[in-house]
């Protein structure tokens, strides 16, 4: 019974971080992440998932404030988004090749690995989705240069392990 109980993650076991993505240090990027299974995409070194054993995929909750976006990034893993609440705009690709689609709750969105993506809450209430990434490894975001440079100007970067840190603690490239 205890072993089964450890594999059930109710909302009271979620550890939300509003500093889970490098973009979160920038205005207009009010996102929060709560890992559930595996280490997922979080860049907050303090976060630990309730279920950390390998499953072949990672699961985490993503929450965006009204008008906020994750910022343009890509990861190596295939990703599926289960949109639970809110109105979303999903943007694929960069620069002149961008394609955006508006989607609503109760929708599933598939994003191929290495595809640039930006998720935006276009509604007036908090938007929430469940994010599933393929593989057991932690997903490491490759941020659009604009995001990385703006974060560095704000005094933030990522350490060698890909976790957010104050720029004055980093000795090399800030992101």
What do these predicted ranges mean?
Residues 38-48, 58-75, 113:
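Conserved short histidine dyad/triad with adjacent acidic residue
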Residues 65-66, 76-89, 93-94:
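Glycine- and acidic-residue-biased ligand/ion/polar-headgroup-sensing regions
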